[in-house]
């Protein structure tokens, strides 16, 4: 596979000049009444203020939301209209499940590469608290028919056909539409298929919380997380509220399995919680960033997406996308300074790490002569991961990009991998570079 050039036709690189996120909050806590669109506006507004850039210079916004709200289907355009940008700023929304803001970043990068724009914003927001609660199909059909009736008798006849069950609200589905399998069930299957023990999963979760707590304590995360003042402005949140600041390994063993009560090993403690939050990054043509006198955080070196089956191993996307991104960057796993993998579940993370190092997997599934290699854990998720920070679906990619670039900078530069699994058997990988 050939090397990928993430550059404009004149040879300029795609630079990331800013990155910011809200604190991530567990479902029904501080952001319990804040819709995703407001979280998105909040973070983009603050990022532009910190960058001190004229909002009218932003030419494109690509934003994502996984849990869609019918009243605001194009979250990107709502963000443009609600943050002081020019009304002529192009804006559209994307969704790639848990890899949504990676897709948003790539879309903006490709617009810059094509010469269509110089400056764009990418990101994502999700609320697991403010949800689109639906109605049954029978009630929906009856309500539609009701609007066309003319007499009271006709209305009563329609309503009399409804049962109590038909009137019950329908929450958003948590299972795959095509298979009926939930993410947790797939994580449980992967734990069993790849012989990943409960102890290994709990140890990874403990590691994630411990490293995230340490990162916050040492001030490494502070500047990339804004203080949020959600309506009605009576309280604020300036830190992620899912992190166990005093994580103890023995406490993880106390939880019961969540998806296979009898033989399972996936628990609430070694899985990401439902989370509310938003994150955004600002991308520019390299020359434009220098012209404006902005400090460049880093560059996108390459990216790749992959799609696999959903009946089994649905969360193995990183193992398929990462080799492609490495090839396109012209590097190997050993060339990386940092590796950051989205931790949807400890089981999924550990299964992917095993497949990174498996020659059998590489030969049989990827058609490669050998594995990309074993991950050096001293480079892996060094500030903790999604198990600790939480996972507002569409925001996680932008969180990872910002967090990784800042950590690379602290280490004097280098190359890093960001990779994530996603619903529908999707995978994303991105190589980032800091000079």
Curated annotation (Swiss-Prot):
Q: What is its EC number?
A: 2.3.1.16
Is the Hydrolase keyword given for this protein?
Answer: no
Alphabetical GO CC annotations of the entry are: cytosol
Q: In which pathway does it act?
A: Lipid metabolism; fatty acid beta-oxidation
Q: Which UniProt keywords apply?
A: Acyltransferase, Cytoplasm, Fatty acid metabolism, Lipid degradation, Lipid metabolism, Transferase
**Superkingdom of this entry's organism?**
Bacteria
Which segments does the entry list as coiled coil? none
Alphabetized InterPro entries for the sequence: Ac-CoA_C-AcTrfase_FadI, Thiolase, Thiolase-like, Thiolase_C, Thiolase_CS, Thiolase_N
Q: Where does the UniProt annotation locate this protein?
A: Cytoplasm
Q: Which SUPFAM superfamilies match?
A: Thiolase-like (SSF53901)
Q: Which reaction does it catalyse?
A: an acyl-CoA + acetyl-CoA = a 3-oxoacyl-CoA + CoA
Catalytic residues, chain numbering: 98 (acyl-thioester intermediate), 391 (proton acceptor), 421 (proton acceptor)
GO biological process annotation, one example: fatty acid beta-oxidation
Q: Which family does it belong to?
A: Belongs to the thiolase-like superfamily. Thiolase family.
Q: Which NCBIfam families match?
A: AcCoA-C-Actrans, FadI, PRK08963.1
The UniProt subunit note reads as follows: Heterotetramer of two alpha chains (FadJ) and two beta chains (FadI).
Q: What is this protein called?
A: 3-ketoacyl-CoA thiolase
